[in-house]
Each structure stands twice: as C-alpha cells, then as structure tokens.
C-alpha cells in the first residue's frame, strides 16, 4: 500500500504527486460520508474497460484498503486507487465542479488521448 498525503499548498522542490485529490473534491466526499453515517468510508476511484472511448472511470465508497491500493489523503479524506487503475492515472487530478450543467466529480487526466462528451470515458 502506498500513502500520499496532499498538502494544502505545494511546496517548492516537492515531487509531483501521482494523483491530485483537490480540496473541493475532498469536501464533497466528506459531506457524502457524513450522510452515509460511516466515518470509515473512503472514496475509491477505478478504471474499467467500457464506455464509448474504451475505458471508463468509476467511483464507489469502500471501507477496505487492499495491499496494492494507493491512498491519497486531502483534508482528512482518503481517495483509494488500485494499482491496475493507477497506471492510467499518473498526473491526473480528481476535482469536484459546480457548473451550469450541474455538480459532478471530474477527472482531469493528462494521459487521456481522447475523452467522451460525458467525461466518464477515455482512451489512451
């Protein structure tokens, strides 16, 4: 298991994180965990085959941490990513955005060569 703690602000000379979990996303996850009533929950991000572009992102709550999970902690909230999914996500940013189309979690993935209009599928 690999654990990365995300600082509130990056310090100069710091190594880039494998995956950024923004404060906005962490705050939304914290409120959802509170609604669930289980403080042991963590948000799991995974990549699976499918979608119109070949791969798709998925989110689920999980209270278990596997040996091959990477954990990223922002403001006390944990994001889990398994090692298979992580290979498609280095340098990606998990964010939560409020826009005209509504509110949603968004993954900004520099490894995606193309994405679907819905934003949940991509190709590499």
Swiss-Prot record:
GO cellular component: cytosol
A GO MF term: 4 iron, 4 sulfur cluster binding
Textual note on the cofactor: Binds 1 iron-sulfur cluster per subunit.
Cofactor(s) this protein cannot do without: iron-sulfur cluster
Family, as annotated: Belongs to the HesB/IscA family.
Highest taxon of source: Bacteria
Alphabetical UniProt keywords: Iron, Iron-sulfur, Metal-binding
Protein's UniProt keywords contain Ribonucleoprotein: no
Function: Required for insertion of 4Fe-4S clusters.
Protein name: Putative iron-sulfur cluster insertion protein ErpA 2
Species assigned in the record: Paraburkholderia xenovorans (strain LB400)
Pfam short name (any one): Fe-S_biosyn
Annotated binding of iron-sulfur cluster, by residue: 52, 116, 118
Iron-sulfur is among the record's keywords: yes
Single GO BP term: iron-sulfur cluster assembly
Subunit structure, as described in the record: Homodimer.
Encoding gene per record: erpA2
């Amino acid at each position: 298991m690999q654990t990365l703690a995300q600082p509130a602000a990056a310090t100069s000379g710091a190594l880039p994180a494998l995956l950024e979990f923004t404060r906005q996303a962490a705050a939304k996850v914290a409120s959802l965990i509170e609604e669930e009533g289980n403080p042991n929950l963590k948000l799991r991000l995974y990549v699976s085959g499918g979608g119109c572009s070949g791969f798709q992102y998925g989110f689920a709550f999980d209270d278990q941490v596997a040996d091959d999970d990477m954990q990223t902690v922002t403001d006390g909230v944990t994001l889990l990513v398994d090692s298979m999914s992580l290979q498609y996500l280095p340098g990606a940013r998990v964010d939560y955005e409020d826009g005209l189309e509504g509110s949603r979690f968004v993954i900004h993935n520099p490894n995606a060569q193309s994405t679907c209009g819905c934003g949940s599928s991509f190709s590499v």
